Amino acid sequence: MCDHSLPRRRYYFHLKDPGSAITHFIGLALSVLSMPALLIHGAGEGYSRMQMAALSVFLLSMVGLYAASTAYHSFDLEKGRNRILKKLDHIMIFFLIAGTYTPICLTTLAGKGGEGLLLAVWAVALGGLVLKLFWVYHPKWLSSVLYIGMGWLCLTKLPTIWAAMPRPGFWWLLAGGVFYTIGGVLYALRLERLNTLHPHFGSHEIFHLFVMAGTACQYVTMFYL
């Protein structure tokens, strides 16, 4: 016989930042689902082991960024653990940028200075890692400057990229850079008037959408290396 005098337990999960968590969870799901297509494409093109590994670095950095962001915006933890998730979230941005460069430098720019550019990009990524580990609450504009500057290091090889990459790939690459840049500027400015749009959808969520658009464009670029 059931004892109805006992209180019922209710189990629910509370998202810390619903809009941000949901947008990048969608990004995470799409990232995971998109992995096989790019790997199959690379194998079909006869990519070397190094080039396949480079594609894998890009894909893993993409999944890593959206997983870290989803976790940070989902879990409302105590201060110390929340700080760890925040560090991971921000560090993965550097890794995604460097991860995006990796297949481009080792495929399109292989033997054309791509290796040097790749070393420079990963050096900045490791510098960003150190910055985020030891100065978590630095000014947001500083992060944006580093992200955008790192992203546009490719301008040093622009003529080579233009000559070596098929036109559709070049324009997708450029579009991705523009989306990321707009997102980075919005992140730095933190426009308060955008936070009045909806209780759970404001400037940070709009930043997330621009990041997702940038990732989508540069994912397509990988089919034109």
Each model region followed by its residue ranges:
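Multi-pass alpha-helical transmembrane bundles in non-GPCR membrane proteins
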Residues: 1-225
